[in-house]
Amino acid sequence: MNRGFSRKSHTFLPKIFFRKMSSSGTKDKPELQFPFLQDEDTVATLQECKTLFILRGLPGSGKSTLARVIVDKYRDGTKMVSADAYKITPGARGAFSEEYKRLDEDLAAYCRRRDIRILVLDDTNHERERLEQLFEMADQYQYQVVLVEPKTAWRLGCAQLKEKNQWQLSADDLKKLKPGLEKDFLPLYFGWFLTKKSSETLRKAGQVFLEELGNHKAFKKELRQFIPGDEPREKMDLVTYFGKRPPGVLHCTTKFCDYGKAPGAEEYAQQDVLKKSYSKAFTLTISALFVTPKTTGARVELSEQQLQLWPSDVDKLSPTDNLPRGSRAHITLGCAADVEAVQTGLDLLEILRQEKGGSRGEEVGELSRGKLYSLGNGRWMLTLAKNMEVRAIFTGYYGKGKPVPTQGSRKGGALQSCTII
């Protein structure tokens, strides 16, 4: 008879005892070496985010074990949705359309609950079409996505999985599922995604900057850069002008991948540093806020560690440019009508190229957070007296980057439709 510890026989022991006991067991297991399980800073940061962990893998590869470890690690505010609970046999989804409908309804219901921060979906998730449905749901409820595949030694070995899977699938059955899981699923882009709290802090700082700039006498003299034609105007509302704003949490893009179709995407995704950093928490430093007639954003100063995740070919406007690596690092805070978010980084490079050429612009005064510089042509830079630090998770954005109806609310009212930028 096993006389080891159990919750039932040791009800007097606090819950935290079992949490520590179970988490300490993950330290020595290679298959559980993920930042979201091992790195305490990441664990703490994820508590401030809405995250959908989508597990992928062949039956018997260790997904369910991994899912339970995640739930056990985060406990409060965490829910697991498992295809097994809906009696879904791994394979083509067509035969289980009603079961998947119920699963998705339950998943969406959890997404709507304010008390749930972390959702874990346990299924094979081997079909692109199915993943795209899940990414759309994540967009709709403003959840960041982390794709997780087991690291067990047998995860792709059909002969071993035949013995391990609970569905008694044959090796041939497993081989049919394998092609969709052998290759990494690349996002639209990789980047650092800010926590909700950090996003709100930075949004507020950006809004105050726009309000102060719009009321500044030096800016009022340059209104023609923002107002078409000869329309007379004494002042303008920059918050409204930059009305095309990112929904949900803010982010700093590292590499645009276009789901693997962009040049260099596959090579970038295969880097060891990326694999080790995926789903890990970072602290980003913001040194300045800027405005141009097209965009407004925050300049990010990357650390040596963060620069390892920065592509080597994105800091140039022309082949002859020689700006330091990481120059383009930024967070888009808003765009003018009909302007795409990619323009924010280009605007920042223009400003930095001008600075490198010896023209830092004219200091025109002090705002609440630092010194204001006029750079000409409607470009303004607020150099922060004290750098801002924001917490973020490094992951991918897997959605379509198109307007989606969003659920949930924030101060100021519900967001009805947003464009992911």
Curated annotation (Swiss-Prot):
Catalytic activity entry: a nucleoside 2',3'-cyclic phosphate + H2O = a nucleoside 2'-phosphate + H(+)
Positions of the propeptide segment: 419-421
Modified sites of kind Phosphotyrosine: 110
Active site residues of this protein: 251 (proton acceptor), 330 (proton donor)
EC number: 3.1.4.37
Modified residues (Cysteine methyl ester): 418
Lipid positions (S-farnesyl cysteine): 418
Record InterPro entries: CNPase, CNPase_cat, Cyclic_Pdiesterase, P-loop_NTPase
Gene3D superfamilies associated with the record: 2',3'-cyclic nucleotide 3'-phosphodiesterase superfamily, P-loop containing nucleotide triphosphate hydrolases
PTM sites of type Phosphoserine: 6, 9, 170, 359
Membrane topology, as annotated: Lipid-anchor
Superkingdom as given in the UniProt entry: Eukaryota
Keyword rRNA-binding: no
Subcellular location: Membrane; Melanosome
Assembly notes: Exists as monomers and homodimers.
Name of the protein this chain belongs to: 2',3'-cyclic-nucleotide 3'-phosphodiesterase
